[in-house]
């Protein structure tokens, strides 16, 4: 029998947790920190893309328009929209023979 097997095999009366009746504040703090860490890790895995996209791009959706005349705002909106619009006439059909 290897040493590892002997270490992994507990004695019957040692199956219970030794810290059940412990009122040590360090044990309580470690338990709370462990639970919070687990919750935060799960939330991080679930909302990974959303959270890091927020950090990367911030809370704003675009540049601030404060103090910019309305005509310039409209011009900016039109440029943004024209960059998004796709002209259907410029597609190229490639036929493989």
UniProtKB/Swiss-Prot annotation:
Subcellular location(s) of the protein:
Virion membrane; Host apical cell membrane
Q: Where is the lipid attached (S-palmitoyl cysteine)?
A: 50
Q: Which residues cross the membrane?
A: 23-43
Q: What GO molecular function terms would the record report?
A: monoatomic ion channel activity; proton transmembrane transporter activity
Q: Tell me the residue ranges located in the Intravirion compartment per UniProt.
A: 44-97
Give residue ranges on the Virion surface side: 1-22
Q: What membrane topology does this protein have?
A: Single-pass type III membrane protein
Query: Any inhibitors or activators noted?
Result: The M2 protein from most influenza A strains is inhibited by amantadine and rimantadine, resulting in viral uncoating incapacity. Emergence of amantadine-resistant variants is usually rapid.
- Alphabetized UniProt keyword annotations: Disulfide bond, Glycoprotein, Host cell membrane, Host membrane, Host-virus interaction, Hydrogen ion transport, Inhibition of host autophagy by virus, Ion channel, Ion transport, Lipoprotein, Membrane, Palmitate, Phosphoprotein, Signal-anchor, Transmembrane, Transmembrane helix, Transport, Viral ion channel, Virion
- Gene3D superfamilies xref list: 6.10.250.1640
One GO biological process term is:
protein complex oligomerization
- Looking at the UniProt record, the site noted as Essential for channel activity, possibly by being protonated during channel activation, and by forming the channel gate and the selective filter sits at 37
Q: Which Pfam families match?
A: Flu_M2
Instruction: Briefly state the protein's biological role.
Output: Forms a proton-selective ion channel that is necessary for the efficient release of the viral genome during virus entry. After attaching to the cell surface, the virion enters the cell by endocytosis. Acidification of the endosome triggers M2 ion channel activity.
- What family classification does the UniProt entry report for this protein? Belongs to the influenza viruses matrix protein M2 family.
- Free-text note regarding domains: Cytoplasmic tail plays an important role in virion assembly and morphogenesis.
Name of the protein in its database record: Matrix protein 2
What phylogenetic lineage does the species belong to? Viruses, Riboviria, Orthornavirae, Negarnaviricota, Polyploviricotina
Its gene name is M
